Amino acid sequence: MSNTPYNSSVPSIASMTQSSVSRSPNMHTATTPGANTSSNSPPLHMSSDSSKIKRKRNRIPLSCTICRKRKVKCDKLRPHCQQCTKTGVAHLCHYMEQTWAEEAEKELLKDNELKKLRERVKSLEKTLSKVHSSPSSNSLKSYNTPESSNLFMGSDEHTTLVNANTGSASSASHMHQQQQQQQQQEQQQDFSRSANANANSSSLSISNKYDNDELDLTKDFDLLHIKSNGTIHLGATHWLSIMKGDPYLKLLWGHIFAMREKLNEWYYQKNSYSKLKSSKCPINHAQAPPSAAAAATRKCPVDHSAFSSGMVAPKEETPLPRKCPVDHTMFSSGMIPPREDTSSQKRCPVDHTMYSAGMMPPKDETPSPFSTKAMIDHNKHTMNPPQSKCPVDHRNYMKDYPSDMANSSSNPASRCPIDHSSMKNTAALPASTHNTIPHHQPQSGSHARSHPAQSRKHDSYMTESEVLATLCEMLPPKRVIALFIEKFFKHLYPAIPILDEQNFKNHVNQMLSLSSMNPTVNNFGMSMPSSSTLENQPITQINLPKLSDSCNLGILIIILRLTWLSIPSNSCEVDLGEESGSFLVPNESSNMSASALTSMAKEESLLLKHETPVEALELCQKYLIKFDELSSISNNNVNLTTVQFAIFYNFYMKSASNDLTTLTNTNNTGMANPGHDSESHQILLSNITQMAFSCGLHRDPDNFPQLNATIPATSQDVSNNGSKKANPSTNPTLNNNMSAATTNSSSRSGSADSRSGSNPVNKKENQVSIERFKHTWRKIWYYIVSMDVNQSLSLGSPRLLRNLRDFSDTKLPSASRIDYVRDIKELIIVKNFTLFFQIDLCIIAVLNHILNVSLARSVRKFELDSLINLLKNLTYGTENVNDVVSSLINKGLLPTSEGGSVDSNNDEIYGLPKLPDILNHGQHNQNLYADGRNTSSSDIDKKLDLPHESTTRALFFSKHMTIRMLLYLLNYILFTHYEPMGSEDPGTNILAKEYAQEALNFAMDGYRNCMIFFNNIRNTNSLFDYMNVILSYPCLDIGHRSLQFIVCLILRAKCGPLTGMRESSIITNGTSSGFNSSVEDEDVKVKQESSDELKKDDFMKDVNLDSGDSLAEILMSRMLLFQKLTKQLSKKYNYAIRMNKSTGFFVSLLDTPSKKSDSKSGGSSFMLGNWKHPKVSNMSGFLAGDKDQLQKCPVYQDALGFVSPTGANEGSAPMQGMSLQGSTARMGGTQLPPIRSYKPITYTSSNLRRMNETGEAEAKRRRFNDGYIDNNSNNDIPRGISPKPSNGLSSVQPLLSSFSMNQLNGGTIPTVPSLTNITSQMGALPSLDRITTNQINLPDPSRDEAFDNSIKQMTPMTSAFMNANTTIPSSTLNGNMNMNGAGTANTDTSANGSALSTLTSPQGSDLASNSATQYKPDLEDFLMQNSNFNGLMINPSSLVEVVGGYNDPNNLGRNDAVDFLPVDNVEIDGVGIKINYHLLTSIYVTSILSYTVLEDDANDEK
């Protein structure tokens, strides 16, 4: 049990024990080191012929555990002895509590509780008196400020935020005086702030004007992803939710989705109404040469009638006879004879009847081990209908199948030629396909045994004996198993400490007969295998005497697999070039001898050769444990071991992500294609929680006296150590978990004494077994609580175990009465459980205010500020975790029902170390918890080499990353709330700037920590030794979150103020879209200078928002380095592939294209008719999905809303002064709140230089295009005011909603709202759903004389709609348009008379009118003219990649269509990547860059 420092006024237990010691001198008799009990030496006057049995006193040692372990004298001081303090292990000084002291301890706890309540009442009274005495009405708003809210803290040592930030630790005697002084200062500050409310403030703590502002996080940061097969809710803490809070991103994505629909129409016209010269039959006939058998058949096996209407049927290249595309030579002679032997040829294994129905084999997107070559060219057709049956007739295929080929995985004849992996609702893959992941293959020299299960279908039934026989072949030899287990408990066990080490080893010994596995205990209490006794013999038999032993076997397999993956040699090699040295941390290899390093290298090389295949776990959980039934419909066999296996299984699914597909493809658990943030983990955790309730883990084991009587009875059953049947009278749960712990003691005692329980030694061992069982009970429960908190933080979902103390009274593991002298590492585990639970309470306080609807709907600013300050104190080490939790409770931020009352027994000295101390521990050779005093050389020699200390420090490192990620999230929420308010309330600019700087600092901190982790995972004996698999995804996820904010700032730095969707940018920080060569030359020069500075950039330093023009370049360098990192990690981790693709995509978007190179080809950066990108037409779209799927996307819903087609006179409701024609409500639409124009926090006074340059560039562009300059345009526009044109066609909506071909065929002409209404009140932006308005009222050319000139200034999309309003003659199928001087067009039509709408550029229209030449519309021209977003130039080729390509309408609405933005689906083809949920978030969060707003001419009219 952890000890609490006792007050001097209260008699301590130490003084009570010392008095008892003085009365009992015999208690100081020397005892055997490491023994749990000590015996009294008999008096000298006693007769030596005494026949009495020596009895050992049941005495608890008085010395601390560390001194007893070191065998030094302990002064028994509380809470920490002098010996532990000198040697730097005061945080581990632990005393076993006396049984008679329990009552005294309870009294002390009551006194401490009453003391805290009195102090809290006093703080509340002072707060109320302050409120009533305040003269102004603003006092009701100011008493909840971060300064005044600290009055709720009561007697907390750090009662003020000033003391917390400075890190001062004052004594209790000075605390009262400091509190009074602070109250006086706060009163003076309140009066001064009320008198100067409008004065500018440079600190958040000074201004209390906005402290009571309410934030509604339920609307701004909440997502609902609607899939075709389910719905997923994502809360504010999910990494995807950042897109909903940023106005820049909302506008960006609204434009992206509208542009996507336009390009889909362009592709549809191009592909549907032009000759498909490149179309070929999907069957590659070159690979199917003619044969005599197929000479009579002239018909292609492809059903050409199934092609979409309007598409030209594939033309047969030659009249050669057709042949089945299957290479029959690959089959055995028993199935299909060679081609020459046609007389006895049997039936082809391909079921050709499926082809006649239009069924085609699925697209082979990923290489399959079954396919020998690409026999079918699936890229030449667009059909992909749902397929529920394999085209191969397996009845004929499996007939006369050679039995000797069943075990040959290398023979291609033993596999079906069809790749079943991409077929929906088909049988599971054979086991051999699951072991083809190249990321975890062993190094050279590793064994490559072929297992029977790899050639057996797992959907077939297997008996238990067959499964055990297969597992015997899959498991490594006995010696290797023992080494793996020791490695796990030495390096990985602190990450999932829910096992009893000795108990688990005994069970493994029983199952696998590892009689030589008895460990040799070293000086540090760590069990090390003896290589001399272990034999390198394989596993020949697996004994499962009890049902629960199957779960132990499953845990063993997970340990073997996870430890093998975590070997440092298996980690991914990361080389970041010159920047690698910045992220290296010192390791401790220099402290190890050469022999120790050599021995470690030999062990690792031996372990690398023996990989446990993932199929072993699949067989165990499916056929032995039957986990699907246990976790869904039955709880008859649920016990503690079952819960332990479920926890290990969930832990393995999150850590070894590359094995997820393998584990779930053959399991009918509803967890298809699970991901790190998918719903599968939620369902599994809910099952684990319910099983824990079923076992009673939520109640403390001390509440059940029958445990004391049941557990000792199991010693008989285990003492026989070979019994196959358990005692039916004993509890199977207790029998499984605690029986093995008493094996040795029971075997030493006589059988009669063991049965009667009269042997004192046996009785003592039984008591120890009971305590260890209760200890495991408590560890499992609190680990489940921690899993619940982590899942809620990751997914943004509500916690399952809310208000823990309302239904659970389970004590912390520190309450277990266990002597840790033989197992010091278990003492560290116990300390960590207490510390981590306290950190979880801090996280719970944040989650309650963000995720709980009742609080998140009206959370106040000062509450978030208080959370930020307390988390800062925790991560910076200025305040102890006990004080932070107490402050949260006293301020009302954390209810006591969450478990805060358990903290009264915790050691104050065992807290979270500072992050620099964790990283620099190896360099300074100091303990993490050094008290600051100089230690002598003798003390250093005596200091313990603590077990798995590096793993514990790695866990501390991950806790720091989690806390700082929360700080980043809280600051980002406040930043996005106050930034748009700057145009209306200038006082919020300072708040937004400070929150943005804090968010950037913590984002860069997470970015650096991510780089530090991956740069040190392969170092020998480093901080992250054996933690490469467990911490890889959390670290990469935090780095990815930081990258999202980087992109947000890059967009602000390059685009300047957000002026609206139909307005020109007031000013820009980056390169403008003009033609001023001097401005361009200066930009190039500045860019070169900034690039030279970036070479000297220190990635370990924070980035300042006031960096000016170099801010975007500095942040871009971070993105490039992260892209380089993820590219190297993609070789090992699948989730790194997604992040690398998205990061690389946005890097290309952020890369500003060179105007000089563009202008050379056509003389204009907007007229590049000859420019062609080599892969534009072949890029697969990120936004590839049909309209129904698109509307389910949470990004689409947030940006556009659910909008249905409306009438011609309908419009949006008036929003913020915008007067629009039409009704105030839209049928079937969702009105979203508008986004106001505002300046970003990156806007500085140095941007004024760009104003005149932008105006000159715009004037030159107008002179180039139109031949005149509007001299009346006012370029000197005040900041924060949008330019308001006079009249005429000054600005049109850049993105008009899509129109279907049916509308054109029906004669409905899209129109645009009245221009006078559009251009009025330009200070406020329209609502987002106006982007998809389908009715656009264009001015009539016959009534407006300025129409001919205005049409030239319209966007290409508007021109497309204008061209649709002309006479369309019927001619050819090429879709070309002939422009005339009047602005009308003659457009070709298809054979059926459908009207065509082409995308014509305004420059093309102008050229056609002057030269009377035919202009062919070009997609690249369209893209180049619409690649400017608020001054940010976007790479047009990347734009195509964002918006996507043509979607075949025949594939729209299919039931098996891939969900748009699937959360758990990742598919990569040869060219691009299909968007997944993770990728699109990066595209949303970072795709700011892909926002392609069409070019606006705001002041171009008269």
Swiss-Prot record:
SMART domains named among the record's database cross-references: Fungal_trans (SM00906), GAL4 (SM00066)
Region described as Heme-responsive: spans on this chain: 244-444
InterPro entries: bZIP_sf, Fungal_TF_Env_Response, Transcription_factor_dom_fun, Zn2-C6_fun-type_DNA-bd_sf, Zn2Cys6_DnaBD
GO cellular component, one term: mitochondrion
Pfam families: Zn_clus
Sections of the chain in a coiled coil: 105-134
GO terms of biological process kind: cellular response to hypoxia; DNA-templated transcription; establishment of protein localization to chromatin; negative regulation of DNA-templated transcription; negative regulation of transcription by RNA polymerase II; positive regulation of transcription by RNA polymerase II; regulation of cellular respiration; regulation of transcription by RNA polymerase II
Disordered, as annotated region: 1-56, 126-208, 432-458, 706-767, 1384-1411
GO terms assigned for molecular function: DNA-binding transcription activator activity, RNA polymerase II-specific; RNA polymerase II cis-regulatory region sequence-specific DNA binding; sequence-specific DNA binding; zinc ion binding
Polar residues: compositionally biased ranges: 1-50, 143-152, 160-176, 432-447, 706-734, 1388-1411
Residue ranges, compositional bias (Low complexity): 130-142, 177-208, 735-759
DNA-binding span(s): 64-93
Presence of keyword Nucleus: yes
Subcellular localization, as worded in the UniProt entry: Nucleus
Positions with a binding annotation for Zn(2+) 1: 64, 67, 74, 81
Keyword S-adenosyl-L-methionine: no
Record keywords: Activator, Coiled coil, DNA-binding, Heme, Iron, Metal-binding, Nucleus, Repeat, Transcription, Transcription regulation, Zinc
Biological role: Regulation of oxygen dependent gene expression. It modulates the expression of Iso-1 (CYP1) and Iso-2 (CYP3) cytochrome c. In response to heme, promotes transcription of genes encoding functions required for respiration, controlling oxidative damage and repression of anaerobic genes. Binds to the sequence 5'-CGGNNNTNNCGG-3'. Is non-functional in terms of iso-1 cytochrome c expression in strain S288c and its derivatives.
Other notes: Heme is an effector molecule for CYP1/HAP1. The HRM repeat region mediates heme induction by masking the DNA-binding domain in the absence of inducer. The sequence for strain S288c and its derivatives differs from other strain backgrounds due to the insertion of a defective Ty1 element in the C-terminus. This acts as a null allele in terms of iso-1 cytochrome c expression and beta-galactosidase activity. Also, the expression levels of ergosterol-related genes and ergosterol content are decreased in laboratory strain X2180 caused by the defective Ty1 insertion. The sequence of a wild-type allele can be found in other strain backgrounds (AC P0CS82).
Subunit structure comment from the entry: Binds DNA as a homodimer. Interacts with SRO9 and YDJ1. In the absence of heme, binds to at least four cellular proteins, including YDJ1 and SRO9, forming a high-molecular-weight complex (HMC) which results in repression of its activity and dictates its DNA-binding specificity.
PANTHER family: HEME-RESPONSIVE ZINC FINGER TRANSCRIPTION FACTOR HAP1
Annotated protein name in UniProt: Heme-responsive zinc finger transcription factor HAP1
Organism: Saccharomyces cerevisiae (strain ATCC 204508 / S288c) (Baker's yeast)
